[in-house]
């Protein structure tokens, strides 16, 4: 485990207006460290997706602070937030979001194009990223020629090809069978061994717990419990009434 790569401090989020207002997050604090895979677990409607959107600089908190590599996101404009995302954050989703007319390598290379990295170097980096997830022989295949598990591997390669500080994965195994789900979690756990990178996996599936260094439980917008792989537990790490 290494230093802090991302942290949320007393984050509140109010959604909606008037009588329909909902406090989706209630003073949540969460720290992601390099060399660590963290699970964020909770039932539907617990605030998992809202917190992930804020950590991913796609949604601003109503109150509180989010820092990415020590840089606070509050007050940043859309262009500044986009720059923080490009340089620091990789995303993996339940649905793979691959372009059907592009090969696996070209889908991965897109992540470098948005960082203004092109040419032969970008092609080589895309191939290397695919090799890391076990797809060295599938670089010229199109998404329709790949299984669901292989498509998710391409999505992971795309997320890490730019060497981000943080990988945020939203239910990455939900659309996969058990065997492919294990393979994907094994890859994410391996990626999380990098001391300069933290991985956060959002899930409701307890079968993913063995892959985690730390498990954070969220309920009704509050982080109610944290556990570590060795069984150490800390209760009620957030929870404003």
What are these model-predicted stretches?
Residues 1-14, 225-241:
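ABC-family P-loop ATPase nucleotide-binding domain
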Residues 4-211, 215-218:
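ABC family nucleotide-binding domain
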Residues 215-227:
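H-loop (His-switch) and adjacent beta-strand-loop-beta switch element
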């Amino acid at each position: 485990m290494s230093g802090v790569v991302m942290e949320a401090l007393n984050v509140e989020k109010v959604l909606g207006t008037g009588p329909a207002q909902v406090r989706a997050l209630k003073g949540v604090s969460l720290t992601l460290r390099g060399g660590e895979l963290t699970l964020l677990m909770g039932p539907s409607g617990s605030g998992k997706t809202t917190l992930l959107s804020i950590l991913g600089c796609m949604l601003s908190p109503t109150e509180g602070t989010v820092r990415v590599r020590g840089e606070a996101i509050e007050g940043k404009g859309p262009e500044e937030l986009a720059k923080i995302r490009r340089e620091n954050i990789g995303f993996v989703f339940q649905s793979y979001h691959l372009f059907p007319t592009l090969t696996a390598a070209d889908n991965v290379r897109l992540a470098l194009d948005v960082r203004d990295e092109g040419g032969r170097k970008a092609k080589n980096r895309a191939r290397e990223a695919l090799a890391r997830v076990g797809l060295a022989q599938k670089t010229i295949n199109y998404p329709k020629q790949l299984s669901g598990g292989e498509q998710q591997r391409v999505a992971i390669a795309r997320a890490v090809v730019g060497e981000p500080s943080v990988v945020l994965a939203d239910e990455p195994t939900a659309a996969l069978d058990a065997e492919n789900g294990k393979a994907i979690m094994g890859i994410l756990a391996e990626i999380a061994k990098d001391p300069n990178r933290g991985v956060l996996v959002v899930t409701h599936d307890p079968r993913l717990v063995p892959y985690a260094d730390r498990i954070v439980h969220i309920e009704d917008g509050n982080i109610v419990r944290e556990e570590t792989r060795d069984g150490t537990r800390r209760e009620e790490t957030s929870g404003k009434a």
